[in-house]
């Protein structure tokens, strides 16, 4: 019997890097809502009292970026002096956006291999490799460690926003270690939560007292509710439980650490449980295959698992800039399928159109911000892009294709 512990982490919406992801995707949403053909590559930097948005944009949309950025920061919770020193009302906002390079645009506008089919005219926005993954460890077909870490992070933000734990501040991280036996999760080994908080809670200001108070509150209001519906639950007797191990966490957010778009790519995907091609998602329009093809790869992998063709599936896609058809498609089932990897790959080639134009069209990736009131990509910029049962994401809905594959 093999036995090991696997660990994944998540971060809250107030983490400096996640602020940047949300700002970049809010910019993307705003531009696509007005002009669905917008080309966007928006990067964000935050530091003490400063937010910079930069990158390349080609669009007919007109957006007040200053107001947009401040609104995102305020919604996260950085909107007063008590929010840890970073304030949407007083921070400097610098905008440095340029146009997309015409050399890149020409390959995306008219693919090198098009031959009559309109979907062949959309070339990949860059070269690269993308991975998608699914497994049967959770109802949403995600690995359990990252699923639990996201649950805790979302709940941490929820009890802050609704006032249940009003002393919490926006910055925070979660980490979950799961025990596996023969590749099946059997126990929760460790839960770690680091959360920013005010300096004094109900008269308690010493480090030991703060940790004890926060630890007890988080178990009651975060850990237990976040795991209540799971068959595998943490136990006070057997699960190691760590809260703010350094003692206190008062200075946080951009006041404590600089943040950048695209620095939480493992949090965004599978928590390290599957491979990653290296490309970030946020701030990129759908012609960037770093984003759209990663969504498609997840769709394929999830469909294979949902159809019962494998218990685990990892899909690798690769693209060349300006070329519509994938350079390669590979499926790995890790010995959990009655079919060979070659057979599964052939099945994918026969049933999925993985050209960028087809991915964009099938998932309506250019139109979703407009259809959802100007707020779509920002929703997935925190707490993961996959396995989101709280959001209606087209790449997560595999019911139709899974039924077809079963037949």
From Swiss-Prot:
Cofactor binding: number and manner: Binds 2 divalent ions per subunit. Binds 1 potassium ion per subunit.
Q: What is its EC number?
A: 2.5.1.6
Kindly list the positions annotated as binding Mg(2+): 17
Per the UniProt entry, what is one GO biological process?
S-adenosylmethionine biosynthetic process
Compartment(s) of residence: Cytoplasm
Q: What is its main location?
A: cytoplasm
Kindly state one GO CC term assigned in the UniProt record: cytoplasm
| Keyword Secreted among record annotations | no
Residue ranges, annotated region (Flexible loop): 100-110
SUPFAM superfamilies attached here? S-adenosylmethionine synthetase (SSF55973)
| Entry superkingdom | Bacteria
The record's annotation in PROSITE patterns points to: ADOMET_SYNTHASE_1, ADOMET_SYNTHASE_2
Which pathway does this polypeptide act in? Answer: Amino-acid biosynthesis; S-adenosyl-L-methionine biosynthesis; S-adenosyl-L-methionine from L-methionine: step 1/1
Q: Which GO terms describe its molecular function?
A: ATP binding; magnesium ion binding; methionine adenosyltransferase activity
Record field: transmembrane: none
The answer on whether this UniProt entry bears the keyword Metal-binding reads yes
Q: Which residues bind K(+)?
A: 43
Q: Which cofactor does it need?
A: Mg(2+); K(+)
Keywords, A to Z, come to:
ATP-binding, Cytoplasm, Magnesium, Metal-binding, Nucleotide-binding, One-carbon metabolism, Potassium, Transferase
Give the binding site residues for L-methionine.
56, 100, 257, 288
InterPro entries named in the record? ADOMET_SYNTHASE_CS, S-AdoMet_synt_C, S-AdoMet_synt_central, S-AdoMet_synt_N, S-AdoMet_synthetase, S-AdoMet_synthetase_sfam
**Protein family per UniProt:** Belongs to the AdoMet synthase family.
Subunit text:
Homotetramer; dimer of dimers.
What protein name does the entry list?
S-adenosylmethionine synthase
Q: Which organism is it from?
A: Synechococcus sp. (strain RCC307)
């Amino acid at each position: 019997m093999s036995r090991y512990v696997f660990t994944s982490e998540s971060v809250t919406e107030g983490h400096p890097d996640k602020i940047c992801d949300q700002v970049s995707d809010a910019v993307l949403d705003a531009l696509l809502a007005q002009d669905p053909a917008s080309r966007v590559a928006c990067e964000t930097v935050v530091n003490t009292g400063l937010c910079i948005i930069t990158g390349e944009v080609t669009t007919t949309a007109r957006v007040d970026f200053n107001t947009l950025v401040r609104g995102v920061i305020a919604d996260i919770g950085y909107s007063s002096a008590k929010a840890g020193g970073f304030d949407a009302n007083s921070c400097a906002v610098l905008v440095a956006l340029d146009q997309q390079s015409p050399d890149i645009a020409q390959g995306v506008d008219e693919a090198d291999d098009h031959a009559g089919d309109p979907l062949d005219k959309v070339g990949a926005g860059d070269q690269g490799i993308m991975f998608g993954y699914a497994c049967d460890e959770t109802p949403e077909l995600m690995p359990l460690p990252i699923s639990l870490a996201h649950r805790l992070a979302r709940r941490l933000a929820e009890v802050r926003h609704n006032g249940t734990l009003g002393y919490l501040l926006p910055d925070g991280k979660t980490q979950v270690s799961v025990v596996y036996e023969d590749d099946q999760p059997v126990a929760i080994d460790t839960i770690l939560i680091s959360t920013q908080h005010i300096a004094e809670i109900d008269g308690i200001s010493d480090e030991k007292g703060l940790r004890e108070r926060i630890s007890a509150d988080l178990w009651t209001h975060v850990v237990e509710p976040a795991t209540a519906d799971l068959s595998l639950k943490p136990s006070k007797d057997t699960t190691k439980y760590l809260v703010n191990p350094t003692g206190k966490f008062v200075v946080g957010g951009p006041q404590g650490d600089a943040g950048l778009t695209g620095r939480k790519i493992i949090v965004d995907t599978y928590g390290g449980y599957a491979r990653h091609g290296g490309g970030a998602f946020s701030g990129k329009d759908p012609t960037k295959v770093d984003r759209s093809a990663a969504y498609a790869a997840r769709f394929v992998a999830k469909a294979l698992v949902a159809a019962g063709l494998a218990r685990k599936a990892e899909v690798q896609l690769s693209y060349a800039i300006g070329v519509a058809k994938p350079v390669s498609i590979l499926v790995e089932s890790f010995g959990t399928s009655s079919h060979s990897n070659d057979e599964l790959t052939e099945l994918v080639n026969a049933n999925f159109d993985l050209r960028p134009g087809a991915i964009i069209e099938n998932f309506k990736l250019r139109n979703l911000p407009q259809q959802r009131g100007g707020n779509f990509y920002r929703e997935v910029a925190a707490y993961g892009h996959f396995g989101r049962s709280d959001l209606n994401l087209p790449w997560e809905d595999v019911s139709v294709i899974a039924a077809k594959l079963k037949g």
